[in-house]
Design a protein with these regions (language model features):
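Active-site acidic/histidine clusters and adjacent loop/turn architecture
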Residues: 2-42, 60-78
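Stable alpha-helical elements in mature extracytoplasmic
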Residues: 16-23, 47-48, 132, 136
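Active-site nucleophilic cysteine motif
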Residues: 20, 45, 117-120
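Acidic helix-start/capping segments at beta-turn-to-alpha-helix junctions
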Residues: 37-54
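Solvent-exposed coil/turn segments that connect beta secondary-structure elements
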Residues: 43, 55-56, 128, 165
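Periplasmic OmpA-like peptidoglycan-binding domain that tethers envelope proteins to the cell wall
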Residues: 50-56, 64-67, 115-119
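Catalytic cores and adjacent binding grooves of peptidoglycan-active enzymes
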Residues: 71-166
Length: 166
């Protein structure tokens, strides 16, 4: 039986519905994946700002602008402005958080939306063997229960969006 693990169980396990767990387990069985590690689910505005900050530091502005839409780009612009002003990490994340809240967290990232309507799940690519990744990706692409699926290098993680049944 495949297993779903959480990088941060106390934060994330309650944000993945029984329905989404069934979807993931079905995909894992079909693709022959014994285990996955979920790295992120629903986020607060502050968590979203922190993650965006870390990704901007690691991947750069240009790369991250390809990942987000117009609202996310405004947060990236806020990062760039604060960075140019010589602000420290905590000040930059605080400024980004304020901007996210002003724009509406759900507009910036679906991770900041309502999990009772949409489960947004990031899976660590490293939790899936390289040889199994193409079958895993194909299985997800063929599953109508997944509304959006992003893969590296566009997204650092496997990013799945699973609409919740009414």
């Amino acid at each position: 039986m495949p297993t779903i693990q959480f990088l941060n169980p106390s934060r994330d396990s309650a944000n993945v519905s029984a329905y989404s767990k069934t979807v993931l387990l079905d995909i894992m069985r079909i693709a022959g994946i014994p285990q996955i590690v979920i790295t992120s689910t629903t986020r607060t505005a502050h968590e979203q700002a922190r993650i965006m900050y870390e990704n901007l530091e690691q991947h750069g502005i240009e790369h991250q602008k390809k990942l987000y839409g117009p609202y996310g780009d405004k947060i990236i612009d806020e990062y760039a402005i604060l960075k140019r002003k010589g602000k420290i990490k905590t000040e930059i994340i605080s400024g980004m958080t304020k901007r996210i809240n002003a724009l509406g967290p759900r507009n910036v990232s679906k991770h900041a939306g309502d999990p009772s309507k949409l489960n947004v799940i990031d899976i660590a690519p490293g939790s899936i063997t390289i040889s199994a990744r193409s079958k895993f990706e194909a299985t997800i692409n063929n599953d109508d229960r997944i509304s959006t699926f992003l893969t590296p290098p566009k997204d650092p993680a496997y990013h799945l969006e699973i609409p919740q049944p009414d």
